[in-house]
Structures are given as C-alpha cells and as structure tokens.
Amino acid sequence: MARYTGPKAKLSRREGTDLFLKSARRSLADKCKLDSKPGQHGRTSGARTSDYGNQLREKQKVKRIYGVLERQFRRYFAEADRRKGNTGETLLQLLESRLDNVVYRMGFGSTRAEARQLVSHKAILVNGQALNVPSAQVKSGDVIAIREKSKKQVRIAESLTLAEQSGFPIWVAVDAKKMEGTFKQAPDRADIAGDINESLIVELYSR
C-alpha cells in the first residue's frame, strides 16, 4: 500500500479526530468539522459499524497518526505481542520510540511527516552520529540533536518555538537553544495523548 499524499484534513475527518498530520501544535477542530465524513455535506449512513469495522478503523487511524505502512505495523504488533506486559501499551511505546516520532516530540519538526523528512535528509544526529532511518528505535539516554549545518533552517526554529509554548512531553528533555534533547524513557500509556483505543487493535490481530 502506497503512502497517502492527498489532503491531510480529509484523513482527520474520516477518523473523526485530529490526527495532527497538518499542524502539530494547532487543532483542526476550528478549521473543519471533524464529526462529519469527507464529502460536500459529509457522508451519512444509518448502518451500525460492526466490531470488526471499528477495530479496522482504529488500526488505520494509528497507522496514519504515526505514518506507518501495513507491513511495518504488523511487525510492530508482532514485536509488542512477543514482549512481556500489555501488548497494546507496548505497541504504542514502540511507535513512540521511532526516531521520526522522537524528533517530532522534541519539537524539531512541526509534524511527524516533517520530522521524517529531517531524518531522511540527514539533519539529525543520534549520540553524535548522523542517522537517516526514520524507523530506528531510540533508547533511553539517547541524545538527539540537529546537525550543525541544519540549525539555520527557519522551519526548525519556528517549530521549536511553538513546541516550547505548548510544552514538551515528560519523557524527553529538550535544550531548545542547543537544538538537542535526551530521550529519557519510553512513555507510560497515561502520558501518551491522543484519542487511541489500542485494545481494539489487539482484538483485531487476535481474531
């Protein structure tokens, strides 16, 4: 399945919640009706969505939030299922520990897509070494920094300013002036914001 390149707001409307694909720090709720489906007047249907439909919809939503394709997502679930503990929570922790997501959480990119681009263009250092693999897993204590020659990019400075205003997640420590941060640990489930019901995904793959 190819990566979606169409209007970002349309995906958020389809899921009925802001996926933060277009703007990481500003909600789409003020710009469009998230409670109506895409279309001129929104698609309506009297049919009740099945349990399977709800489970599939939740999986699609999480894939879109983190920008992960189906094959990657299955691998993440298999790894989460293999580990001890709550499978759904572990799945979200694995997704949150992706390098592109950590770059986004530290405010270097205004969206995950922009953060992924920074990683792919070798603008990111991990423990002093350039790493251009968006899916790389970040570990506790890893230091993420903007490469020296990329620090002059206006979009990075603007994104950091917005991130400082809205606040950073508690599992990262960011020095905005140095344009670097430390990944303290994978987040607890309670610290992961967003309208996500990971139990539906576990149910889907347990069918």
Curated annotation (Swiss-Prot):
CDD domains, A to Z: S4
Domain S4 RNA-binding: 97-157
GO cellular component labels: small ribosomal subunit
Superkingdom in the source lineage: Bacteria
Positions of the UniProt region annotated as Disordered: 33-54
Biased composition (Polar residues): 42-53
GO MF annotation terms: rRNA binding; structural constituent of ribosome
BP GO terms, sorted: ribosomal small subunit biogenesis; translation
Pfam family, one: Ribosomal_S4
Subunit-level organization: Part of the 30S ribosomal subunit. Contacts protein S5. The interaction surface between S4 and S5 is involved in control of translational fidelity.
Name of the protein in its database record: Small ribosomal subunit protein uS4
